[in-house]
Regions:
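Short beta-strand elements
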Residues: 28-56, 204-236
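Short, low-hydrophobicity acidic/polar segments
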Residues: 1-106, 132-151, 155-158, 190-192, ...
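Extended serine/threonine-enriched, polar tracts that run as long, contiguous segments within proteins
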Residues: 83, 137-216
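Surface-exposed, beta-sheet-biased, low-hydrophobicity segments with strongly acidic/polar composition
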Residues: 6, 14-17, 108, 119-127, ...
Length: 267
């Protein structure tokens, strides 16, 4: 140990394969401590899983503190997004094939906080083009209860950049259609599904899924798990026309527990 106090920083993952370096990197110097990350369409493209990126810091450490052991408490920098579903009526059944989220920021830089108990900050440039990330595909999920939610992605959560989502303003003339929502970079869900009520098909058929679109807005927070329960009734066409009774949301935010990993470092 040197005589002066030291600042320690740790990052998880610490190293990545060469082909992943374009998506993830970190920097820790005297003046700059930041993480750059680009989310991948993990469940659509399927080429790579997203990293649960974490950091830890211990500043002003000396040899006399903790018997010369540096203790780290890792914190998540991304937001976790999970979906469930219910039906609006007890005699309704929904079969889900695909869910996608359109038009959210998927890349940015996270600057570490000045102190370990701080929260840090994200900066992301505005979207340059419309895009969609997959929640599930080829899902074959049946939802047939209006009281108990059916799990969709609790075990396969999305990891996304924290941000405020602007929902598709389908009621406004300037953004009535899906194309206009894309041009305005407004957020919505794309859902390929079949909807039946008392056995009769209201959307799709026994052999065909139909696609509906649902305005989607919220604020994703760093280190939080956001759970969305879709209450199925219907949605909108790509021209912004209502299909049946549009889907409602029941949103919940829970703590995504920090990793209490004590990593012992003895310089």
């Amino acid at each position: 140990w040197p005589s002066e106090a030291l600042d320690f920083y740790a990052f998880n993952p610490g190293t990545v394969s060469e082909d992943m370096m374009v998506f993830y990197s970190w920097e820790a110097t005297k003046d700059v401590q930041k993480i750059s990350y680009t989310c991948m369409d993990e469940y659509g493209a399927g080429t790579h899983a997203n990293y649960d990126v974490m950091y830890a810091m211990a500043k002003g450490q000396t040899k006399d503190m903790n018997n010369g052991i540096v203790k780290f408490n890792f914190k998540h920098i991304l937001s976790q997004v999970v979906f469930k579903a219910k039906t609006q009526y007890d005699n309704m059944q929904v079969d889900i094939d695909v869910i996608k989220i359109h038009n959210f920021k998927f890349a940015g830089a996270f600057t570490l906080p000045a102190a370990a108990d701080g929260t840090g900050s994200w900066s992301s440039s505005d979207l340059a083009f419309p895009h969609a990330f997959t929640v599930v595909k080829n899902a074959n999920i049946t939802v047939n209860s209006n009281t108990e939610a059916t799990d969709i992605t609790t075990n396969t959560p999305m990891l996304n950049i924290p941000q405020e989502l602007t929902a598709w303003k389908v009621s406004e003339t300037a953004t009535k259609s899906k194309l206009e929502a894309d041009n305005a970079k407004q957020c919505y869900l794309e859902i390929a599904c079949k909807i039946r009520q008392s056995g009769a098909y209201l959307l799709g058929s026994a052999s065909e899924y139909k696609t509906i679109y649902v305005p989607f807005g919220d604020t994703w927070e760093q280190g939080k798990r956001h759970i969305y329960t879709l209450i199925f009734g219907g949605g909108y066409t790509d021209q912004g026309e209502a299909v049946l009774n549009p889907i409602q949301f029941d949103a919940e935010t829970t703590g995504w527990v920090d990793a209490n990993s004590n990593v012992n470092v003895k310089p």
